[in-house]
Amino acid sequence: MQHRLTHPRIHALEAALASRPPLRAPAVAGQAQAAVALLLRVHQGRVELMLIRRAEREGDPWSGHMALPGGRAQADDAGMAATAARETREEVGVDVATGRLLGALDDLAPRSAAIPSIVVSPFVFHVPENVEVRLNHEVQLALWIAVDELLQGDAVTEYLHDLADGNTLRFPAFDARGYVVWGMTHRILTGFLELYAQTGAPEASE
């Protein structure tokens, strides 16, 4: 089922995504592939984005991080968009088939050598406002936040990572209602927000 587009920002975002084909990373032997979903809904006249907090899991480099629904590709996935759809259904119970695929963002890879070699493909979906969310064991919480909140100056912050040698690394981050979004998710959101900001003026809450 294709969910009807009812918000001008959604229309404009779909057009903006269509106007700029995403940059795809060349295939590298042995490199893992993954996909994430930027789930958008319209609530009280504002476009909102779903963020999740991953459960604490030993051995998971993204344990406890704020993130987007998604995960690694499987051999039977019919492309990376299908990977994003399957992982979203498994992690948060949302079937993106009830909505619409708006487009894709550029592929990204981790910048840290401590993270496994992987390429992540982000996809943007519009889903119904009343979509049901059911978290599995991999996800601690799901949060809907107005996209325009992330565009405000006070959402810009830093994540401080303390090293064993006593030094501290600083990473650019977003403050999403008290939850710090950094790393690859911050990079994905930065690219998305740059595009979204071009689609219209900020929305007033109702």
Which residue stretches match the model-derived regions?
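A mid-sequence, solvent-exposed acidic-amphipathic segment
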Residues: 150-158
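Short, charged, solvent-exposed linker or helix-capping segments at domain edges/interfaces
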Residues: 133-137, 154-155
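Acidic, glycine-rich loop-and-strand cores that form catalytic or ligand-binding grooves
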Residues: 135-149
